[in-house]
Amino acid sequence: MSMRPPDPGQASSRARARMVERLRAQGIADEKVLAAMMQIPRHAFVDEGLAFSAYDDTALPIGYQQTISQPLVVARMIEILRAGRELGRTLEVGAGCGYQAAVLSLVATEVFAVERIRPLLDRARENLRPLRLPNVRLKYADGNLGLPEAAPFDTIIVAAAAAGIPGSLKEQLAPGGRLMIPLGSADQRLVMTERHGNIFRESRFEAVRFVPLLTGTE
């Protein structure tokens, strides 16, 4: 009797379903965010040797001293930004392997994702191509500077930690817009800034661990 090999698509779907149920148990309640996490295949954004860990709640290395954020952090940041509003035109700083941009594409009108490391940007393009997401645009740029040619943005999400919020990013936030960034070095916290005219109001959330936000391009 011959044995049929397991269907990787079905295995991935089951693993994603378990991940989503874990996210729900961890407090993620935004059904649109959970649906996006269910739809995007996280294993397609990591090296083949790490695919078995793709749906664990952990950050994974993607090369160049960068990581793909743990699923809970991705879901939590987007859920906070979506509370009571739509994301609209969104800037992601630190595209990395492209996973978060893919998730954002399902909950935002447009996604502009910038990455300062050229080989990572190329990898993100390769990872995203099979998904055919028409509302995602990738750009090779220093994320500290934002993307002035596409500003203003209703939402800005930064996937790297900084000592303070870069002024360029605040300037590119639309009135009523929200910006999420990890702040701190050893002790980091998620901080959301909301723009009301020229006034920026900050709200602080849980502790996190991100790679540092660096300047320039590589």
Swiss-Prot record:
Enzyme class, broadest EC rank: transferase
Annotated protein name in UniProt: Protein-L-isoaspartate O-methyltransferase
InterPro entries from the UniProt entry: PCMT, SAM-dependent_MTases_sf
A single GO molecular function term of this UniProt record: protein-L-isoaspartate (D-aspartate) O-methyltransferase activity
One Pfam short name: PCMT
Lipid metabolism is among the record's keywords: no
Active-site residues (renumbered): 69
Gene: pcm
Known role: Catalyzes the methyl esterification of L-isoaspartyl residues in peptides and proteins that result from spontaneous decomposition of normal L-aspartyl and L-asparaginyl residues. It plays a role in the repair and/or degradation of damaged proteins.
Organism: Aromatoleum aromaticum (strain DSM 19018 / LMG 30748 / EbN1) (Azoarcus sp. (strain EbN1))
Entry's transmembrane regions: none
Main location class: cytoplasm
GO cellular component: cytoplasm
Protein location: Cytoplasm
Superkingdom, natural source: Bacteria
